[in-house]
């Protein structure tokens, strides 16, 4: 997600105008491309490095590295699903609005986290509720 200047809303411009939506569409598509390229590099790297080491220490090190790479790729797969979901919300007109309250998420939050589905307030409420639930479970 490099190389994108923050969107500057023009005076009188509606929230989630066509220009604004196109700005976020381009950010999301670029982010998706970067992630897909990284996945391809990892697969290639793992194929190249998949040697059968006779030394158990070398084999253990390689398995540990592969495990870390696979966990990273799993997180990236989840992020790709969020990106695809955000792109779908751009298409259906719900992008930029809180999934819980329907209020504007806000440009600053979307610039920081283009896949955000909740306003800052809704996210804080959710995190507080989760913390309280965990605290209750720890008793």
Each predicted region: which residue ranges?
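Short functional micro-motifs and their immediate structural scaffolds
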Residues: 105-106, 127
């Amino acid at each position: 997600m490099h190389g994108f200047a923050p969107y500057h809303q023009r005076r009188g411009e509606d929230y989630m105008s066509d220009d604004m939506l196109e700005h976020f569409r381009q950010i999301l598509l670029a982010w998706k491309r970067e992630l897909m390229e990284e996945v391809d590099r990892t697969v290639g790297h793992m194929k190249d490095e998949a040697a059968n080491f006779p030394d158990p220490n070398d084999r253990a090190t390689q398995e540990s590295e592969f495990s870390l790479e696979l966990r990273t790729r799993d997180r990236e797969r989840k992020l790709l699903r969020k990106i695809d979901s955000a792109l779908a919300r751009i298409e259906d007109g719900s992008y930029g609005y809180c999934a819980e309250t329907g209020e504007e998420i806000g440009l600053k939050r979307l610039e920081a986290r283009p896949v955000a589905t909740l306003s800052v307030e809704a996210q804080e409420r959710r995190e507080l509720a989760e913390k309280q639930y965990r605290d209750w479970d720890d008793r």
